[in-house]
Regions:
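Divalent metal-binding pocket/active-site signature
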Residues: 17, 42-45, 106-199, 204
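Acidic (Asp/Glu)-rich catalytic clusters
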Residues: 3, 28-29, 66-77, 96-106, ...
Length: 274
């Protein structure tokens, strides 16, 4: 099994601390064979909203140029993939699809951080009330689009909750795993979250209960470092996460396919024409 990671952020998202090239060098030094750089995507909002946790639209071109430059510069030492981490914002998904085609994005990972759009400031980590259902519904709807290589931190809803799982959340975890199985969308074992669990002394995400549920389905799992600083690419963390994930009866994969966004667009057009 190759040591790979497709969940990498840089200082461009305004809440991570590693520069692009620093992250690449850290990955090489720590034995990674493939590094996917997948910073939080920009969005073309209908409003004048400015997000605090992602690059702005006018910052994307520099991000793209940098990743492609590093991909070529370090091609003899590591394979670099050009990705983004994106939510499922229904009213902006057509724009995102066209954006991925135009910019030849290799893949998206699905980070379900906000409900509907972050313009509304409804954060889904530790969601309460009606947004518990909203979290799981949007996970499922997003996974069904075929636009995402995998679902990142599927247990994000447990953030800042102490890891308490209600019957409603347990049912939602089953829905995620059933959709993962039916639509062949892998699930991420999030290594940044594992670090948080270790510091706190209890589980939020990743959570044992979730992966016990996942083992009841025919799902695929992938490690995601969710690197926000160069220390997050430590090989020891990767190995520890692999050891933990290997305890569950799930298939562990080390690669994700490039997503054919042109094909997805063509299939949508066929549906519209019917």
């Amino acid at each position: 099994m190759r040591q790979t990671n497709f969940h990498t952020h840089t200082s461009r998202c305004h809440h991570a601390y590693g520069e692009d090239e620093e992250m690449v060098r850290a990955a090489i030094q720590n034995g990674f064979e493939v590094l996917g750089i997948s910073d939080h995507t920009c969005w073309k909002y209908d409003s004048d909203f400015v997000a605090h946790m992602r690059m702005k639209l006018d910052e994307f071109a520099d991000y793209k140029d940098s990743v492609l430059y590093l991909k070529d510069r370090y091609k003899k030492q590591i394979e670099i993939r050009f990705g983004l981490e994106a939510e499922y914002f229904p009213k902006y998904m057509d724009w995102l699809l066209d954006f991925c085609i135009e910019n030849e994005i290799d893949y998206l990972i699905f980070g379900n951080h906000y409900y509907g759009t972050d313009e509304d400031h409804i954060y889904l980590g530790g969601a309460k009330g009606e947004y518990i259902k909203g979290y799981f519904d949007t996970c499922v709807e997003g996974m069904k689009t075929g636009m995402y290589a995998y679902l990142a931190h599927p247990e994000l809803i447990l953030r800042d909750t102490g890891g308490f799982i209600t019957p409603e959340i347990e049912e939602g975890f089953h829905c995620i795993c059933k959709t993962s199985q039916d639509y062949n969308v892998p699930l991420e074992f999030n290594v940044l979250g594992m670090q948080h669990n270790m510091r706190m002394g209890y589980e939020e995400y990743p959570h044992t209960k979730f992966w016990q549920i996942a083992a009841q389905y025919n799902v695929k799992a992938i490690l995601g470092m969710d690197a926000h600083r160069i220390g997050d690419l430590d090989q020891k963390l990767y190995n520890l996460a692999l050891e933990k994930l290997s305890k569950f009866d799930v298939e562990i994969i080390d690669d994700v396919p490039s997503i054919d966004y042109k094909k997805i667009k063509a299939e949508k057009i066929k549906v519209w024409q019917k």
